[in-house]
From Swiss-Prot:
Source species: Rickettsia felis (strain ATCC VR-1525 / URRWXCal2) (Rickettsia azadi)
PANTHER family per UniProt: CHAPERONE SURA
The protein, known as: Uncharacterized protein RF_0255
The keyword Signal belongs to this UniProt entry's keyword annotation: yes
Record carries keyword Transmembrane: no
UniProt entry keywords in alphabetical sequence: Signal
Highest rank taxon of the organism: Bacteria
Taxonomic lineage of the native organism: Bacteria, Pseudomonadati, Pseudomonadota, Alphaproteobacteria, Rickettsiales
Signal peptide, first to last residue: 1-20
């Protein structure tokens, strides 16, 4: 009897040691723990929201990486927010918005997660972190400005609109090495169309003022002009055994309506906000003390 009792105790002890060997903490962010329960709940939630029933070992590894990353990012955002609470109304509205997007009745999303044995707290926690992120983006948007020059460059690069170009084209009088050197020196002195004096080039070159649509300018020159901003001179290039420089005086984009302009402004604004946010989140991660204790 004593021997049997000893075996039972030994087995019980071994079982408890095995259980204890499972890491209850799977990661920490600035010494704040992420628990095994949180990790498992997040994996379950991701599977439920994507209607995934089973996984291969490789897919499970990908899911684990995704879950731990989302929990780490979430922890960083909560630490950034500090004591600032997310109002319940904002959380409810965010959930309703997701339900509307997926054509679900209001109140059914959390019920669906519960039916899949998913802890709704994990989902709500992610909603809160996304709302914190949106508040950060909103704050960053107030420091973002888009210049008219940036708008013009974006529209030009789209090749959707024609452009009226005014430019000064300087052509050397001959094609020798001396002419090439003189044209290079001229290029370095060309700053603004309004400041160009005949004495700058008259001994070795001619100058022609051209105003035309970009689409009507011949191939090589069109490519050169397209990449130049106003009051910017091109490098010296060769045409018909002579050397040329183009100095763009102005660019006027034709037939852009208000809606198109606003679309470009919004696109550039969102791009700048996204870049600022990405840099901010990267700095958060770099400065944070992050430890992951998941087995590789």
């Amino acid at each position: 009897m004593k021997k049997l009792l000893l075996i039972i105790i030994t087995v019980f002890f071994a079982f408890n040691v095995a259980q204890a060997s499972l890491p209850n903490i799977v990661a920490s962010v600035n010494y704040e723990p992420i628990t095994l329960n949180e990790f498992r709940a997040r994996k379950k939630m991701i599977m439920a929201l994507n209607n995934v029933e089973s996984l291969t070992p490789a897919q499970d590894k990908q899911l684990s990486d995704l879950a731990i990353k989302s929990l780490i990012d979430e922890s960083l955002l909560f630490q950034y927010a500090g004591d600032r609470e997310i109002p319940q109304e904002e959380i409810d509205n965010a959930i309703k918005s997701i339900e509307d997007h997926n054509k679900m009745p209001h109140g059914s999303l959390l019920q669906y997660l519960k039916s899949r044995s998913v802890n709704p707290d994990s989902f709500i926690s992610q909603i809160k972190s996304e709302l914190i992120k949106m508040n950060i983006l909103s704050s960053l948007s107030r420091s973002v400005q888009v210049s008219n020059k940036e708008i013009d460059v974006a529209i030009l690069s789209s090749d959707q609109k024609d452009v009226e170009i005014s430019m000064q084209v300087f052509t050397s009088k001959d094609g020798g090495n001396k002419a090439f050197t003189q044209m290079n020196n001229l290029k370095n002195r060309l700053k603004k169309c309004a400041d160009v004096k005949k004495s700058l080039y008259d001994n070795f070159a001619t100058m022609q003022i051209i105003t035309d649509k970009l689409s009507k300018i011949e191939g090589v020159k069109q490519t050169i002009v397209k990449d130049l901003s106003s009051d910017k001179a091109s490098n010296v290039f060769e045409v018909n055994n002579k050397f040329e420089i183009i100095l763009v005086c102005s660019k006027k984009i034709l037939n852009v309506n208000e809606d198109e302009n606003n679309y470009v402004v919004n696109f550039l604004t969102n791009k700048k906000i996204s870049q600022k946010a990405q840099k901010m989140f990267e700095n958060m991660r770099k400065k944070a003390v992050i430890k992951i204790m998941l087995p590789s």
